[in-house]
Amino acid sequence: MHLVDITMFYAAEGGGVSTYLNTKARWLATRSQLRHTIASPNVRSGSTAPTLVNIPAVPFPGIHGYRMPLSVATPARILHALQPDLIEAGDAGPCAWAALRAARRLKIPAVAFYHSDLPRLLAHRFGALAMRGASNYLARLYRQFDMVLAPSRLMVQQLAELGIAGALHQPLGIDLGVFCPQRRFTTLRRHLSLAPETRLLVYAGRFTAEKKLALLIEAVCALGQPYHLLLVGGGAALPRLPQITYIPFKRDQQALARLLASCDVMVHPGDCETFGLIVLEAMACGLPVVATGGAVAELVDANTGLLVRPNSVDSLAEGIDAIFHQDLAALGANARRKAQELYDWNLIMPQLLSRYDGLLGSCQHAGLDAGPICVSD
C-alpha cells in the first residue's frame, strides 16, 4: 500500500502542514505493509526518513518562501510514476490539480486537506472581490475530490457554505511526549535579561500580515511593564522594541517545546487559522491561551484561556491583563488535559487511516490498520 502526499506547504522550516506530514510519515513507518511519500517543491529528492520527492517549481511572491509548480503536467507525471494507491493534496494550487489528474489516470482515490483559508486570506489582502473569486475557485476544485478533510468545524462550515457539503472534520494532533510541561526551564528570564516578576508572553510561527502581530505588539506596548513578548519565528520585519524579544524559528521541536513551556501565556492574535497547531502545542506544554477567534476558538475556552474580540488592540490588551488575574496553573493544567484527551496523535492518526480505509475499500482494510473514527462531525 502506497500513500502519497503532495503539497507546496511542506518545508524544512516547519509549520502546521509540515508537522502533520512528518508525524504521518513516522506513524506509517511503523507499519511495514505501508509506504509513504511526500512530494513537495520545497524538498530535495532522496531522503528516506521521510521519503521525499521534489516537484520542480519556482519561488512565488506572497506565499512566504514556499515554491509553486508552474504547470500541472509535471507534478502529475511525477505522481503517476510513484504508483500510489491514494493521493492527498495539501494545498489548492497546481499540486491539487496534479493530484486529480494522476488519480484519474491511476483510477485511485484523491483526498484534499483544507489547510489554508484561502478566501479569507485573499480578502484581507485584496478585498471582497478576491474573496468571491477564491470561493468560486475552491468550490470548483474540491467538488472533484473523492474526500475533503478540514481540521476544524469552522472550516467544515465554511466549505459547506461554498457548496462542498461532504467535507469531514479531521483535526490535527500533538506529540504529548515532546510538548509537555516538564520541558520548562526556570532560567529563561535570566537568559533574556528579564526581571523575575516579568509576565512572559509567547507567540511562535510565521511573521506574516494575517497573523496580525502588529496588533499584538501594540497591545503589549500599551500594557507596559511587567509584560514582555517573546516572538519565535521569522518573516516580515517587525519593530525592535524593549518589550519584545525575537528568537529565530526553532526547527527542533524539543527546543520549541522548551521555550513554550518556559513562558506564562500563549497569545495568538490572528483569526485566519484553519486549526492553530502552535496553540495546541502550547496548551500541551501547560500554557493558557489568549486568542481572538477563527478555528483557534475551538481549542480555547474559559477553562483553558480567554477569547477576545479580533482586530482590537484594547480587547487584546485587556484579555492579556485579565488572564494574569486568574489561576494560571489551573488554566494550564486544563489546557494540558484537553490536549491529552482529544488531540493525541495516537488518537488522531487511526482516525485519519479510517477515513482512507473508507475510500480504498474493504479488500485493502488490512493494509491500513485503521482504527475507529472518534471525531464527531
Label each PLM-derived region with a short phrase:
Residues P288-A291:
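Short hydrophobic beta-strand element within catalytic cores of glycosyltransferases
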Residues M1-N54, C221, C374-D377:
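N-terminal subdomain of nucleotide-sugar transferases
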Residues F249, A302-V313, D321-D327:
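Conserved acidic donor-binding segment of nucleotide-sugar-dependent glycosyltransferases
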Residues V4, A195-K211, I217-V220:
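Conserved donor-binding/catalytic core segment of Leloir-type glycosyltransferases
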Residues N136-F185:
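Donor nucleotide-sugar binding/catalytic pocket of nucleotide-sugar-dependent glycosyltransferases
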Residues L79, Y142, R258-C263:
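Short alpha-helical donor nucleotide-sugar binding micro-motif in glycosyltransferases
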Residues A237-Q254:
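Nucleotide-activated donor-binding/catalytic signature segment of Leloir-type glycosyltransferases, i.e.
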Residues D271:
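Aromatic "clamp/platform" in nucleotide-sugar-dependent glycosyltransferases that forms part
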